[in-house]
Amino acid sequence: MYAVVNPATGEKLEEYPEISDDELDAAIARAWEAREALTALSAAERAEKIKRLGELHLERRETLAAIAVKEMGKPMEQALGEVDFCGDIYSYYADRAEEFLKDEPIELLAGEGTAVIRRSAMGPLLGIMPWNFPYYQVARFAGPNLIVGNPILLKPAPQCPESAEAIQKMYDDVGLPEGAYQTILATHEQIARYVKSQAGS
């Protein structure tokens, strides 16, 4: 169950519906479709959107922090610090995208020719987030992977659906391709079945 519960009183403030199996399948399909659109953008274009995401965290810091206070009882000063740190994380990866993604020559042990390490998109990635840092954990996972070109399926902690909703809104607002970042309010059982179905693929 995804719900905002006052950690001091135990009062349930708002409940969020879990997705169905069909909705989960559709989200996964959208993520695979988004891979093509995401990798069609240049690294600089992807980085520009992630840079803007960091700016949105700073512009909305008070609202985002207040959500964390409500959901998990984090002191406001700490919540603001977490949101600000996310702005730094997104900016860090965006500003260094070209450097991080450039081919890295490696020395051949034998023979002739050249060899490089090339970092390229693998496909959709699933992030299962804990409750204690609802913004930071997403930033460090999603930011760099989206710059590479990997779409993100993000399962938030059951205690943090409102912060997940606010994060989704920011990702939508920066104009990433549809399906590139999706919040999925899935059950543990749904995720376990999906992960098991992908074993060895």
What are these regions (language model features)?
Residues 1-113:
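N-terminal Rossmann-like NAD(P)+-binding subdomain of aldehyde/semialdehyde dehydrogenases
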Residues 105-201:
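Rossmann-like NAD(P) dinucleotide-binding subdomain of oxidoreductase/dehydrogenase enzymes
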